[in-house]
């Protein structure tokens, strides 16, 4: 059982390593504008995409040769998620994002992550504006009074 886990990690590393040359980081953090300690964040977690791909095609990703022989098909299928649907963040904001959405955010959370990045940016750009909290909910005719 432990061997499978090891190979699963290796499959993820093999897939990641092959696509890294296609990454393009911006020159500053999308939230704070810092140009130091920049990291690329994938809104669609690579390890989750790899697991999904292997499951859909019923591939045994404990076999390195199978991983390597399917790498280009994986890149082609998920090029948008791997290369384009990403954001450059400073290390601080990248860590904050992962505190909110966990180390391996589920694939369905991509749009929520994008909204979170925008919200953090808005907070920095407009520190005086506070999020309005609805304190009272009226129902029936009371809404019109």
Swiss-Prot record:
Keywords on record: DNA-binding, Endonuclease, Hydrolase, Late protein, Nuclease
GO terms of molecular function: DNA binding; endonuclease activity
Function: Endonuclease responsible for the single-chain interruptions (nicks) located at specific positions in the minus strand of the viral genome.
Enzyme Commission number: 3.1.21.-
Species: Escherichia phage T5
Keyword Ribosomal protein tagged: no
Entry protein name: Nicking endonuclease
Signals that turn on the gene: Expressed in the late phase of the viral replicative cycle.
Chain segments annotated as transmembrane: none
Sequence segments annotated as region (Disordered): 126-145
